[in-house]
From Swiss-Prot:
One of its GO terms (molecular function) is proton-transporting ATP synthase activity, rotational mechanism. Keywords: ATP synthesis, Cell inner membrane, Cell membrane, CF(1), Hydrogen ion transport, Ion transport, Membrane, Transport. It is a peripheral membrane protein. Belongs to the ATPase epsilon chain family. It comes from Actinobacillus pleuropneumoniae serotype 5b (strain L20). HAMAP family: ATP_synth_epsil_bac (MF_00530). This is ATP synthase epsilon chain.
């Protein structure tokens, strides 16, 4: 039995996940972070991307986050994000439409806020693609 710890993923609107996991992987500001039971305490910013966690049965699950914070304590890891969406709830058509709109607007002006929005949509699309390739492999 692998060592477990509690993972809590919370958005500004609601708790997205709370349960025991054996590992979690997050896109930190300075690179990818992998956390296992007994990890050194840590507080860091995370960038838009994927939270990937592994349950005790080996099943991997994915959540898109728009950025936020990761707090690692001895028995609990907390991800706080403005926006967090379970991978299976992502809508490819909406993501692609938002991405196209951001690209079109960005091509007409150089705006840091629009560039950040485009980065978030691309990160969201990556999570969607990973989740769907995993689902296709299960069939």
């Amino acid at each position: 039995m692998a060592s477990q710890f509690e993972l809590s993923v919370v958005s500004a609107e609601k708790e997205i996940f709370n349960g025991n996991v054996v590992s979690v992987r997050v896109s930190g500001i300075d690179g990818e972070l992998g956390v296992y039971a007994g990890h050194t305490p840590l507080l860091t910013s995370i960038k838009p991307g994927m939270v990937k966690y592994t349950l005790e049965n080996g099943k991997e699950e994915f959540i898109y986050v728009s950025g936020g914070f990761l707090e690692v304590q001895p028995t609990i890891v907390t991800v706080l994000a403005d926006v967090a969406i379970r991978g299976e709830e992502l809508d490819q058509q909406r993501i692609l439409a938002a991405k196209r709109k951001a690209e079109d607007t960005l091509s007409k002006s150089n705006n840091a806020e629009l560039s950040a929005k485009l980065s978030r949509e691309i990160a969201k699309l990556r999570v969607y693609e990973i989740v769907n390739s995993k689902l296709a492999n299960r069939r």
